[in-house]
């Protein structure tokens, strides 16, 4: 008995029909895409007061070009955490981009991942209680703190009743959300799903914590040149704020409502390392297995893959492990792009953002240049796209996302 796959009709055909994102380059995805193709960077010197207050070792990052809160009313600010406000903003934008379709709410799901959720409200609530006692804690504190809050806000906003879910798997959360949304659809539990990831803003505590792990770049004098995925001289990642969502649905559902698909979502692979809390397994075996599984479910072979959108954080061990994973999966012939070189790392949102970029590569037949890839690492044998955009006949692509805790997620996409 053969493995069921999208290619052999074992799973229904799933398509991507709308995308949206906000980034440190632009508040909309199409302008972000143009900026990436032009070699722009969203990473700059941070001017936040907390940088000098705490004399942080890392003084660079990428704030959103257009702050989420500039679109929020007074009640939104009081009743929702930051990621919930981002979810509301992006959910509305995505639905408008999709043409505000009429869908059956009982066949409509929402899956949105995050790394920390509304964690800032924990600190705020503690400070209020410390200053004035328990009665100063807002009755809305729980709903603002809960990690599933952003997905719940979108589900309420759009009326989704086929399930609202929130993967919390560190840096793979956004991609895992898309994977679970795909599963909801191919298992017959939904026809359409909003999926993606959101994350909080750059703050002092996360910078301090990741810096103490020696995971972040300290090239403070060269912000735009700091994030150097796969480069021999890479020294860590840089934070870059973002949020991203996509609308996926069965091809049959999309055609029935007259939607124009952007790409196909063909398969999703999820594995774990069982190796270390924060370090990837250097051999890349289980990460590579996630890639292989996504191809199996898609009905593709490694030779079919023209492009890999890499997790590429620019940490010395992470990039080397990913290169091994790509080799293990047999996809080392593919053209590789590392978006974090330009956009930085948005933790729970980044997998969704990079999935959206993968869709745009397949739509437009072009891969943006990986910034700051100047000195190839002799230990990494990959075809990294750098210097200028690379145009080509890209049919199939894989997006990789790997998270602390040993989480590995790979998504297989196809040109429509």
UniProtKB/Swiss-Prot annotation:
One GO term (biological process): fatty acid biosynthetic process
Single GO term (MF): identical protein binding
Gene3D superfamilies the UniProt entry points to: 3.40.47.10
Residues that coordinate or bind substrate: 311, 345
Variant or mutagenesis effect after changing residue 340 to A: Loss of activity with hexadecanoyl-CoA
Locations listed in the record: Cytoplasm
GO cellular component, one term: plasma membrane
SUPFAM superfamilies recorded: Thiolase-like (SSF53901)
Site (described: Interacts with the inhibitor thiolactomycin): 171, 311, 345
Post-translational modifications: Phosphorylated in vitro by several Ser/Thr protein kinases (STPKs). Highly phosphorylated in vivo on threonines. Can be dephosphorylated by the Ser/Thr phosphatase PstP.
Protein purpose: Part of the mycobacterial fatty acid elongation system FAS-II, which is involved in mycolic acid biosynthesis. Catalyzes the elongation of long chain acyl-ACP substrates by the addition of two carbons from malonyl-ACP to an acyl acceptor. Involved in the initial extension of the mycolate chain and forms monounsaturated fatty acids that averaged 40 carbons in length.
Family membership noted in the UniProt record: Belongs to the thiolase-like superfamily. Beta-ketoacyl-ACP synthases family.
Subunit structure: Homodimer.
Misc. comment: Identified as a drug target. Inhibited by isoniazid (INH), thiolactomycin (TLM) and related analogs. Highly sensitive to cerulenin. Is the biological target of GSK3011724A, an indazole sulfonamide. Inhibited by the indazole JSF-3285, which is a promising preclinical candidate for tuberculosis.
Annotated protein name in UniProt: 3-oxoacyl-[acyl-carrier-protein] synthase 1
Species, as recorded: Mycobacterium tuberculosis (strain ATCC 25618 / H37Rv)
